[in-house]
Amino acid sequence: MNRIKDYSKLEFDIDRWIKDYYYFHAIESLVVGVSGGIDSAVVSTLCAKTGLPTYVVCLPLDSKFENSKLSDIHTKNLESEYENVTRVEIELSSAYYHFIHSVNWWSDAQHFDKEEFTANDLANANTKSRLRMVTLYQIAGAKKGIVVGTGNKVEDYGIGFYTKYGDGGVDIA
């Protein structure tokens, strides 16, 4: 395993890579979902440090209070420290519950076993991830930007631990 020896060079290389992508594709902003975890904190900070227009997005959705609080603190700090950063917060719980209600209504009409159909925790978690992804892309579309992924190498490329068309749905990572 190769160990990183020069973190300043790594930061410079990431900064250059993001800027090269940004200018080559003539985009106008970076959009990063901030969960309150370390991965999104690092990625959002690296994006902020580029000096490019960056939208850091909090998407509370039945989140653990601690994660929402950390996300809130981190994004507010970035917005106050970097002039290029805009903080966005969109509460998604009501949209999620409306969707689940609609699916429940449909399952009743189709005579599905409602408990089996709606009680699948993995499916519900994946739906939350996909709702967040759709929201990030809505912001990116409105701001002529790209969605920057926050997954880490082991999760995304090693064991494939991400939601297809959810947190794995990004433009660059």
Question: Language-model features: where?
Answer:
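A mobile, often basic/glycine-rich helix-loop segment
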Residues: G160-A173
